[in-house]
Amino acid sequence: MADRELTQPDRQLLAAVARLAGVDRVRVMDETLHGESRSTFAVAAGDDEFVVKLVPGAQRAINNQRRLVRLVRELRRRGYPAPEYVGVGESGGTIFTVQRRLPGQTLHAGPGMPPAPELFAAVLPSLLAAIELQRDAGDLAQPPWPAWLLRTIETGGDGYCLHATMRQAPRTAALLDRLQTLARRSRRDEVTTRDVVHFDMNPANILHAGGRLTGVVDWNIPFDGAGQGDRGFDVATLLFYTYDIEQTREALWERALELSGLAWTTVYLCHLSLRQVEWSRRHSPSSADDARFMAIAEAVLHDCAAQGA
């Protein structure tokens, strides 16, 4: 699920972006996009601003991104604060999407840092209401959820959730063993599969203006069948990434349990613990980011067990 690393866009790609956006030409904006993956860049055409996201893969990637555009358009029709997608394009083997840029700034204070507690508390009610609009918005009769999610816990993922990273140190190895044990005994009860799932609903992908929610960005369907499952996973994601904000922790726990129950909320938090701890340990070992997410993961797993998981 690793994103394509962005290099300087070439003229051919920019011309294709302009055609898709219905303008004569676009210029690359000289800024780093916060709240989007490293495979994105912003362009301007007159007074209009767009976000271009590069997507790895070939024809199948095009089909998945077209499906993404359909899903997000349906969410917007329901009133969801998602970006307006102009469409999906291809240039020289590069697949890309173009969306209109939403106003606002990201919730997080910086990479790996939590949002200000008062700010997050102000935005949270609107964010939970938005997630509720994902209910029954999926388009697949038999989505692969949660089988692929469970595989990340058992064997690892494609470019993320790497178990080899976790086995390199006693503390992370113990965390992996613990979350696997918790997840295995929590794989019970019926699971929701009909909702749209963002899958990375962390503060870096949430926009606000003065404490008012303005958008949820960085939508993606990286493989066949992704983007559909249990919307409670997105609530669990918010819970994990803001676990050190006491002001909102209880409300997020309550909503996660209402949607998914303790068993599946535990499975989701086990995956999130693995995903973020492994990523931080591999990319920024011994950093404040690494330390913060390790502490959150240990606290999350402790609290899951304390509730009876």
PLM regions: where:
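Active-site activation/catalytic loop segments of kinase-like enzymes and analogous catalytic loops
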Residues: 231-261, 270-288, 298-299
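An alpha-helical support segment within catalytic cores of ATP-dependent transferases
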Residues: 6-24, 132-199, 293, 297-301, ...
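ATP-binding pocket architecture of kinase catalytic cores
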Residues: 30-141
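Active-site Asp-x-Gly
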Residues: 194-196, 207-252
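Anionic group-transfer/hydrolysis microenvironments
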Residues: 55, 102, 202, 220, ...
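A short acidic/basic microdomain associated with nuclease active sites
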Residues: 24-30
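Short, flexible/disordered intra-domain loops and linkers
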Residues: 2-5, 59-63, 227, 283-292
